């Protein structure tokens, strides 16, 4: 039996050569995965679409068909005019080539400012889509994203100006990751997501960053089993709550990863999760001031509202027996022994 081929093309290849390689492929040796990474230029997009359409027609059992769409300017150099221009290009392209997008399973977009209905229209066109990643994409400042899709399994959002993301009806959605939301209310509103199992939230907290209450955020998804929170070595933005409030939403939780807590922060507050999550099997805590990624200039920190390191107050109670069976990982570049001592003191071990 012939071995299925995995094909990856980048913008460094001339597209005439790309088309030639795809068209010359023996149909009896199927392509299973086709990943194409390219820049959003009108002529290139059309050439890519034609080449990929022929590959889809020839190799009808493509397990993965992915577009990773770049823009000519990186996010930090994009003005609003750039974002609007790139989104207009993309909308023209998808309108000209709906058949190709209907066959995609994975799509990663960057640096696009859409209209209100554009992203829902993209989801409607991409009928097979299983994974969507939006990096510095939105529908304008304070826009609200409404997401519905029958096949989507994974949603990943990096930054952008969404005021809220409503996950309305996603029957197959399993994984959600949201990095760097812009506003103070809960960044995600969960509707019908019956298979959601993994949630990852990453945020650089400043003085104005509101605390998230897990009892409210997860009220409609009490079946989540894997929760990952990354604090980027800055303010703790999760509010410790009484176990009686949290137990109904954390009862199915098996894995918790608390990443990049600021050094010097007392980790006793993390015990509220242990007290509420009766099915927890693994708790991983990383305490680290990541100087390569943190803002270190004192004046800039003051101007942007970064806060001084402050402990989160939490009065620990009596720890139930199931905590003793939870595997706990503690990681810190310089204070691992202190972390273990703190945790043992907290648990009374």
Spans of features found by a protein language model:
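Leucine-rich repeat
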Residues: 1-148, 158
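Conserved hydrophobic beta-strand positions in leucine-rich repeat
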Residues: 2, 32-39, 63-68, 81, ...
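Acidic, proline/serine/threonine- and glycine-rich low-complexity intrinsically disordered segments
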Residues: 2-12, 317-320, 326, 331-348
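Short, solvent-exposed loop/turn at the beta-strand->alpha-helix junction
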Residues: 14, 41-48, 72-78, 90-92, ...
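LRR flanking "cap" motifs
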Residues: 19-31, 245, 319-329
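A structural signal for leucine-rich repeat
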Residues: 49-56, 76-103, 120-128, 143-153, ...
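Loop/turn-rich, solvent-exposed surfaces of beta-rich toroidal or solenoidal domains
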Residues: 258-292
């Amino acid at each position: 039996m012939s071995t299925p081929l995995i094909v990856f093309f980048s913008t460094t290849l001339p597209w005439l050569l790309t088309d030639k390689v795809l068209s010359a492929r023996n149909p009896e040796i199927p392509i299973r995965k086709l990943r194409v990474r390219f820049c959003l230029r009108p002529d290139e997009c059309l050439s890519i679409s034609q080449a990929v359409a022929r590959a889809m027609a020839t190799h009808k059992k493509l397990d993965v068909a992915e577009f990773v769409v770049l823009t000519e300017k990186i996010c930090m150099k994009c003005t609003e005019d750039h974002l609007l221009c790139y989104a207009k290009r993309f909308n023209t392209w998808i309108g000209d080539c709906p058949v190709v997008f209907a066959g995609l399973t994975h799509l990663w977009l960057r640096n696009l400012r859409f209209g209100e209905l554009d992203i829902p229209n993209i989801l409607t066109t991409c009928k097979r889509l299983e994974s969507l990643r939006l990096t510095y994409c939105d529908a304008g400042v304070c826009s609200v994203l409404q997401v519905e899709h029958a096949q989507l399994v994974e949603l990943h959002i990096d930054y952008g100006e969404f005021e809220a993301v409503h996950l309305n009806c996603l029957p197959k959605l399993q994984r959600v990751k949201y990095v760097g939301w812009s506003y103070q209310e809960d960044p995600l509103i969960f509707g019908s997501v019956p298979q959601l199992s993994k949630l990852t939230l990453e945020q650089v907290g400043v003085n104005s960053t509101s605390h998230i209450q897990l009892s409210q955020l997860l009220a409609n998804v009490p079946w989540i089993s894997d929760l990952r929170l990354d604090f980027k070595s800055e303010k703790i933005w999760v509010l410790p709550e009484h176990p009686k409030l949290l137990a109904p939403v954390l009862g199915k939780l098996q894995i918790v990863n608390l990443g990049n807590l600021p050094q010097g922060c007392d980790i006793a507050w993390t015990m509220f999760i242990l007290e509420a999550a009766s099915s927890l099997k693994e708790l991983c805590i990383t305490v680290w001031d990541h100087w390569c990624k943190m803002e270190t200039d004192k004046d800039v920190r003051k101007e942007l509202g970064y806060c001084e390191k402050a402990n989160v107050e939490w009065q620990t109670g009596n720890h139930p027996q199931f905590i003793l069976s939870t595997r706990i990982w503690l990681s810190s570049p310089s204070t691992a022994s202190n972390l273990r001592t703190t945790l043992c003191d907290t648990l009374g071990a």
